[in-house]
Amino acid sequence: MLGILYSFRRCPYAMRARLALVLCLPKASLELREVVLKNKPQAMLDISPKATVPVLQLESGEIIDESIDIMHWALDQNLQLKEELVPLHFKDEMKDLISENDGDFKWALDRYKYSDRFEHNEEYYREKASAFLLKLEIRLTNQKYLFSDVVTLADLAIFPFVRQFAHVNKAWFEQQGQYKQLNDWLAEFLEGDLFASIMKKYSAWLPEHTATQFPE
């Protein structure tokens, strides 16, 4: 095996890491360790003190504990797919869009999802998030995916966060005419085999457990 992946099924950061790993790696390349966030395993804390998933511990001893870096590592293992998912002429623009997702949009998303913990109400944070969502909607108006008619790294990196936003109030999101293309884009990922392959449920990892191979 190439290493160990500490993951949490519903975390959008972990989701996007798993998406890239499933696409790029041969089956059974990694050991998957499902983490319970309220009881994180000491083995993970020892290698990544920031204590967030995902964490990839490579056989060489290298630790990669940022999801986007895990995605890029996965792509480096499959250079042919990397050329398809990260077209050179879109590389900088894709990086900027992913950074906006991980920055301002994620800030608003967290507060929208847990508005009772913050200063303003749900609608306030939903409105804050809408600028980014409308930017995605515009991109999808004349093409199937965010940068062209084929999936790129940006789609894989951003989709789990749009999914999380939509699920805060699914009925409201699906009724919004302003997000028609975004709804279709999201539905395609949610209904696809790739997403199903990364969302299998696993028991929380314990040291005495038999290793779970990933991708399956």
Q: What name fits each language-model region?
A:
Residues 20, 192-195, 202:
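A structural signal for the main folded, soluble domain(s) of proteins
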Residues 77-81, 168, 192:
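Phosphate/oxyanion-binding loops and surfaces in catalytic or ligand/nucleic-acid-binding neighborhoods
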Residues 1-130, 137:
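GST-like domain detector, emphasizing the conserved glutathione-binding G-site
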Residues 202-216:
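Acidic/histidine-enriched, glycine/proline-rich intrinsically disordered or flexible terminal extensions
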Residues 83, 196-199:
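Acidic/polar loop patches that form or flank catalytic/metal-binding clefts of enzymes
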Residues 73, 168, 198:
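Residues that scaffold the ATP/ADP-binding catalytic core of kinase and kinase-like folds
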Residues 93-191:
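GST-like fold's C-terminal all-alpha helical module
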Residues 40-43, 81, 141-142, 147, ...:
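Glycine-rich, flexible loop/turn motifs
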